[in-house]
Regions:
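Positively charged, low-complexity intrinsically disordered leader regions
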Residues: 1-62, 66
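Short beta-strand elements in bilobed, periplasmic/extracellular small-molecule ligand-binding domains
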Residues: 72-86
Length: 86
């Protein structure tokens, strides 16, 4: 049975139940299959996502930006200086 995760936020894997984790894995498998077959999917169409990382990592930031773009969204990176966290 599908769990409604609309509006749910999580920062750690511990924030998800086992059932929610399985649902995330199932969705990721489906999206990966669609990517490889060239099937269009825009799960994040019309969405803007803010990315905040505690440590600078170009590879991680680029990976997230590419993933968000592939899903039809817009990613915005905010560094520590942008958010006045220092």
């Amino acid at each position: 049975m599908a769990v409604n995760m609309k509006g749910k936020s999580f920062l750690s894997i511990n924030d998800l139940t086992l059932e929610e984790m399985y649902q995330v894995f199932d969705l990721s498998r489906t999206l990966k299959e669609k990517l490889y077959t060239g099937e269009e999917h825009h799960l994040l169409k019309g969405k803007t996502l803010g990315m905040i990382f505690s440590k600078p990592s170009t590879r991680t930031r680029i990976s997230f930006e590419v993933g968000i773009y592939q899903l039809g969204g817009i990613g915005m990176y905010f560094g520590p200086n942008d958010l006045q966290l220092n």
